Regions:
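Conserved N-terminal entry element of GNAT/NAT acetyltransferase domains
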Residues: 1-12, 116-117
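Conserved beta-hairpin
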Residues: 10-11, 15-30
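A conserved beta-strand-loop-helix scaffold within acyl/acetyltransferase catalytic domains
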Residues: 32-39
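Conserved acetyl-CoA binding element of GNAT-fold acetyltransferases
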Residues: 40-51, 110
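Conserved GNAT acetyl-CoA-binding A-motif
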Residues: 41, 70-85
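Conserved acetyl-CoA-binding loop-helix of GNAT-fold acetyltransferases
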Residues: 49, 55-69, 93, 97
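Conserved active-site alpha-helix within GNAT-family acetyltransferase domains
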Residues: 60, 86-105
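Conserved beta-strand-loop-alpha-helix junction that forms the acyl-donor binding cleft
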Residues: 80-92, 108-117
Length: 117
């Protein structure tokens, strides 16, 4: 299924401390969370794709859908950050391929950011 044909369920919440969106990919094959608050800005977290559905473009579709929501509902130009375990070189490389850059690193976590997406 082409990325443009994917379907998502988006659940939005407003909290005292900010807003969250949870995006679920077609038939529950994967999900990602967007959080926005005054302290941390916009953060992607919890990207998860069921093992049998990996390497089929679902993770990429979820990240791109999250970026679309940030552009349209939060505002274009808002930086998006995320954290990856520093030992997970494959995932760091994948996020780099998607356009994210490392902006902070320690032995436990690598912080990545995308701007002008």
């Amino acid at each position: 299924m082409a990325e443009s044909e994917r379907r998502f369920i988006v659940h939005r919440n407003e909290w005292i401390w900010g807003r969250t969106w949870v995006i679920v990919a077609e038939v529950g094959t994967g999900l990602i969370k967007i959080s926005q608050d005054e302290d941390d800005g916009v953060v992607l977290s919890g990207l998860s794709v069921l093992p049998e559905f990996r390497h089929k473009g679902i993770g990429t579709s979820l990240v791109r859908e999250a970026e679309r929501i940030v552009r349209e509902e939060i505002g274009a130009g808002e930086d998006i950050t995320l954290s990856v375990e520093s030992k997970n070189k494959e995932l760091i490389g994948w996020y780099s391929w998607l356009g994210y850059s490392v902006y902070d690193y320690d032995r436990n976590y690598t912080e990545m950011i995308i701007v002008n997406y």
